[in-house]
């Protein structure tokens, strides 16, 4: 959306875009597919299982290079994602875990479903002007985007990094978009601040109370990279106070 706003020639609506924040985002699958080493290093798979994941990942990368994005997605889905495949994913079979948004949890917290009823209340419907429209959870949208998921948007991100404030953040406990995978992707972006970012010091970020470490930050120019401690894929759910502090600093800083 941000790239479309940036490149619009005669937009119907003028949007004063100032920046974007990307949280645990699949930006460039080809450089973010190293699940084998990550899962091995956090102890969720052994060396044999890691070897299987590595081989499957290489096949998916080749499909991406060949423009076979749907085939690449099917490997990703069977390996970890588990949204489309009928049987459990390989990750589920070898780890026993149903939840890949936080490696400290084995199952999805029931609290994650509470919002469904809340957003459909009359008060919320009125506040967000949706009338009696049916609430959808996104599954139908995903089904229509299967061929797009494995496509890279790194070239678009590069353009945005040269023109706007950009923050990319990851929860330390996320599996499906793990921090090392994002860091690897960032290292491959060809932008004007790349060399400076390589040498940029990593700074400690404290919680609002100053009593604990919220995470770590690296910043060069208008680009900020953040690792958030004690959080997984769903940062506002795991660490709401820290999430608010982070986004407030980004907007107002």
What do the PLM-derived regions correspond to, one by one?
Residues 1-253:
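Terminal and linker regions of secretory-pathway proteins
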